[in-house]
Amino acid sequence: MSKQCLLSCFLFFCFFIPQLSFSCPQDQRQSLLEFKNLLIHNIKDNYTAFEELGTWRPNSDCCKWLRVTCNASSPSKEVIDLNLFLLIPPGLVSSSILRPILRINSLVGLDVSFNNIQGEIPGYAFVNLTSLISLDMCCNRFNGSIPHELFSLTNLQRLDLSRNVIGGTLSGDIKELKNLQELILDENLIGGAIPSEIGSLVELLTLTLRQNMFNSSIPSSVSRLTKLKTIDLQNNFLSSKIPDDIGNLVNLSTLSLSMNKLSGGIPSSIHNLKNLETLQLENNNGLSGEIPAAWLFGLQKLKVLRLEGNNKLQWNNNGYVFPQFKLTHLSLRSCGLEGNIPDWLKNQTALVYLDLSINRLEGRFPKWLADLKIRNITLSDNRLTGSLPPNLFQRPSLYYLVLSRNNFSGQIPDTIGESQVMVLMLSENNFSGSVPKSITKIPFLKLLDLSKNRLSGEFPRFRPESYLEWLDISSNEFSGDVPAYFGGSTSMLLMSQNNFSGEFPQNFRNLSYLIRLDLHDNKISGTVASLISQLSSSVEVLSLRNNSLKGSIPEGISNLTSLKVLDLSENNLDGYLPSSLGNLTCMIKSPEPSAMTIRPYFSSYTDIPNIERLIEIESEDIFSLVVNWKNSKQVLFDRNFYLYTLLDLSKNKLHGEIPTSLGNLKSLKVLNLSNNEFSGLIPQSFGDLEKVESLDLSHNNLTGEIPKTLSKLSELNTLDLRNNKLKGRIPESPQLDRLNNPNIYANNSGICGMQIQVPCFPTQTKQPAEEKEEEDKEEEETIFSWNAAAIGCSCGFLIAVVFMSYNELWK
């Protein structure tokens, strides 16, 4: 028995007691467990946190926990690093959750980046973290200003507060961080001047303040930071000149000052930056003067040069100097380039991105440029002429080609089928002839823009497995049937202003991702009901104006639940308007940014730099829509035009009463029912069209008075009611009172009102109910008059008889 007891004691001391001894300090373990409990309490279903913090158990050594690092060389085994990167899933938590871990004063590194922490940074809790060397709080929702307590962390070498919503200013106390090597404050709301005290941070290697609200000038003290390798101040409001002594920063590899308000010239000292690899000065409209090529061509390590959007700068290479660098990216868009495409590009064999658009370049597309292994070529908005070299499309490296708005001519080469392009824009040139059938063999073509040329014939059929998402062939001379064969992912089909004819194809119902279909100004026939039945509910914009469609609009129109723009004007439609028009979901509620934006289509192509912005710049017509607005055809050109909601059924033969259900379309901005045969009253429900800006009901047979409810239309700035049979007083409201052009009410039965300076008489101002009441009253008065007359006559007769009888007796 005693042996068993001794054995039990031995096992207890061997196995159980060691489990109670921990390497990390007890108070630090408790702080970590408190943080874990707060996190689990605040975030439900936090599978990431539950899994990764599963090792954080009360009866275990915190030095063995995931995301925790202890000082193995110290006897106390204190926690020195916490890596909480991407721990918290979607769902905001308060910054107070950090308080427990900020009590661990032995921390050297703390990373809470890419979480969903909101609120002010708890500055007071950082006071005791005097050993902290690296602090990463990037990519959260911290707000308020940078707490001054952070500037007391004098051992700090890396401070990253980027991608939050921090405001306020950057204090001059930043000078206290003498050991700081990286200061990263990108994408916040920090404003004011960059403090001159920043020049005291002599150990600084990286200074990135991109996308804030800094103003004033770049402090000259920056030139004292001779160890700097990266300066990124782009997308602020910085003004004045680039410091002349910027050339002192001889270790600089990246200088990015783009998208500010800088002025003056590019300082000559820039040629001293022999280690410079990236120079970005684009979109500073105040920069002026010449760009001496000799300064830049001596920068042997330069790989990225972006000067676009500085239309006051003039490129000068009069010395015909050839560069010593090998660029990978070059953008001189809108830099005053003239003459032929520069010859010095011949030796830029490493070039993958070239943008020389919006200049005054002339001549032909050089064969040597087609031979370079460039991925992205943008030469739009120049004066280039001639035909395209066939070898241009035989380079497997070419992914992006934009030649829009030049004077290129001739036929599109048959070799186009050998290309690997994803984005091809040849719009607004003088290309003619037919489109080669080989174009359908381009394996990964995503966007094709051939609009505004003189192309003719039938458009080729794409294969069902095509990746084509965006097609614009509008404003050409194509004929034959409407193209019907595209890949299943097609979302944009812009085919207006051609000579397409015949009925609408059956297989459009396979385009389940179709968002915009524009076929206006063609010769398409058939019934509108058949056409609408072919469309997916994903369609947001449907423009079929000026075709030969017939029949009535079907009740099934309401199945197009995403529809925001419907233009069926200038066709041969007849019949009544279906009440289901009032059930178009996206015209009832305010529209939001949709898949019509660039991002969903091209965000995955990371090998094409800035493709979203480039497409946005080069494909302006994609964002335009011609509508009948303000009594004429007008172009809605707006990056946000997809926020418009529009219903245009004008110039048809529609008849009957206007359904009151149209008043449900509360987000409608443009409503045009003009030039039809509508009759009856203007619906009172039109007063509920609270967002409407343009209302055209002219050239119909509408009767009655203008509803007083229209006085509620506070956004209305265009109204046309002429050529109807309306009468009575024009309702008064601040908005309607401004619409005082008599022409918008012309040719009606008897409209009056102060807006058109026509006085209203009592008989003109009675509402229908009042008129009925007046008629009933007159009828009652008439009956009363005849009854009174009859009673009077009867009484008179009786009196006469009595009098005569009495007179006889008297005799």
UniProtKB/Swiss-Prot annotation:
Endpoints of the signal sequence: 1-21
Membrane-protein topology: Single-pass type I membrane protein
Record: glycosylation sites: 46, 71, 128, 143, 215, 251, 347, 376, 407, 430, 499, 510, 546, 559, 583, 672, 701, 747
Sequence ranges on the Extracellular membrane side: 22-782
UniProt subcellular location: Cell membrane
A GO cellular-component term linked to this record: plasma membrane
Keywords: Cell membrane, Glycoprotein, Leucine-rich repeat, Membrane, Receptor, Repeat, Signal, Transmembrane, Transmembrane helix
Record-annotated membrane-spanning stretches: 783-803
Keyword Membrane: yes
InterPro entries assigned to the protein according to its UniProt record, in alphabetical order: Leu-rich_rpt, Leu-rich_rpt_4, Leu-rich_rpt_typical-subtyp, LRR_dom_sf, LRR_N_plant-typ, LRR_R13L4/SHOC2-like
Keyword S-adenosyl-L-methionine among record annotations: no
LRR repeat segments: 104-128, 129-153, 155-177, 178-201, 203-225, 226-249, 251-273, 275-298, 299-322, 324-348, 349-369, 370-395, 397-419, 421-442, 443-466, 468-488, 490-510, 511-534, 536-560, 561-583, 643-665, 666-688, 690-713, 714-738
Annotated Pfam families: LRR_1, LRR_14, LRR_4, LRR_8, LRRNT_2
Cytoplasmic compartment residues: 804-811
UniProt record similarity statement: Belongs to the RLP family.
Protein name: Receptor-like protein 46
Taxonomy of the source species: Eukaryota, Viridiplantae, Streptophyta, Embryophyta, Tracheophyta
